[in-house]
Swiss-Prot record:
Annotated organism of origin: Rhizobium etli
Pfam family, one: Fer4_NifH
Listed GO MF terms: 4 iron, 4 sulfur cluster binding; ATP binding; metal ion binding; nitrogenase activity
Chemical reaction(s) catalysed: N2 + 8 reduced [2Fe-2S]-[ferredoxin] + 16 ATP + 16 H2O = H2 + 8 oxidized [2Fe-2S]-[ferredoxin] + 2 NH4(+) + 16 ADP + 16 phosphate + 6 H(+)
Protein name: Nitrogenase iron protein
InterPro entries cross-referenced by the UniProt entry: NifH/chlL_CS (IPR030655), NifH/frxC (IPR000392), Nitrogenase_Fe_NifH (IPR005977), P-loop_NTPase (IPR027417)
Stated family: Belongs to the NifH/BchL/ChlL family.
Assembly notes: Homodimer.
């Protein structure tokens, strides 16, 4: 158990976090690692590409059916997928009712008590990261996840979420062993995306672990409920995920305590990269358009 690496993938909704994590973990198992995935996203889509199936039944859903979590057996919630990867989805309540983080807390406690963490090299938490509320921060707060990898892109809200997640890590870094492992950029083909990702990583006292290029083969594999590693193992994109997996595998003990920036500093960075226009630029453009309209009359 001393060699167990507990990693977590955080990122804003829709960033491709679950797809990136599952492809990376499929590549890690190909390196001979034994893996347990704990899905901590209410969408419960953290394991479907590994299981080649629709979203699996969640711990909270099964507990509600049986009466309580104490009535469940480990085999009820744990399914084996690609090359023996163990998969669990914590789940969440009905929309608008209760705290979605409660499922995370309930699941992790149940799994630990029932020996799910025995005989694995990696436990990977796939966590929603738009908001780092108490429940979703649980893998960080309770000193479970030791290495956090933030999946982001060059889009403003993805950068904003990455900075917020870094704030959550910083809050618990001194009381526990949690560290920021690095950023993973899931390309959205925005302007100067690689440069911007590297710059944000540097500002956060971290590094860009890997830049994952955009490729439609990812969607083709997803439609078949498969990772690219399984669907097209010889493809260039599969090679990208293998490179990412190797970098994470080599990154043990190299995490850092992040240095999040303010919203103003983030906006200044976007201005420096020409991604966002200043008020003066926008006003000048508006005046130029108005002048052109007047001149045309």
């Amino acid at each position: 158990m001393s060699d167990l690496r507990q990693i977590a993938f955080y990122g804003k909704g829709g960033i491709g976090k679950s797809t990136t994590s599952q492809n990376t973990l499929a590549a890690l198992v190909d390196l001979g690692q034994k893996i347990l995935i704990v899905g901590c996203d209410p969408k419960a889509d953290s394991t479907r590409l590994i299981l080649n199936a629709k979203a699996q039944d969640t711990v909270l859903h099964l507990a509600a059916q049986e009466g309580s979590v104490e009535d469940l057996e480990l085999e009820d919630v744990l399914k084996a997928g690609y090359k023996g990867i163990k998969c669990v989805e914590s789940g969440g309540p009905e929309p608008g009712v209760g705290c979605a983080g409660r499922g995370v807390i309930t699941s992790i406690n149940f799994l630990e008590e029932n020996g799910a963490y025995d005989d694995v090299d990696y436990v990977s938490y796939d966590v929603l990261g738009d908001v780092v509320c108490g429940g979703f921060a649980m893998p960080i707060r309770e000193n479970k996840a030791q290495e956090i990898y933030i999946v982001m892109s060059g889009e403003m809200m993805a950068l904003y979420a990455a900075n917020n997640i870094a704030k959550g890590i910083l809050k618990y870094a001194h009381s526990g062993g949690v560290r920021l492992g690095g950023l993973i950029c899931n390309e959205r083909q925005t302007d100067r995306e690689l440069d911007l990702s590297e710059a944000l990583a540097a500002r956060l006292n971290s590094k860009l672990i890997h830049f994952v290029p955009r490729d439609n083969i990812v969607q083709h594999a997803e439609l078949r409920k498969m990772t690219v590693i399984q669907y097209a193992p010889d493809s260039k994109q599969a090679g990208e995920y293998r490179a990412l997996a190797e970098k994470i595998h080599a990154n043990s003990g190299q995490g850092t305590i992040p240095t999040p920036i303010t919203m103003e500093e983030l906006e200044d960075m976007l201005l420096d990269f020409g991604i966002m226009k200043s008020d003066e630029q926008m006003l000048a453009e508006l005046q130029a358009k108005e002048s052109a309209v007047v001149a045309a009359q």
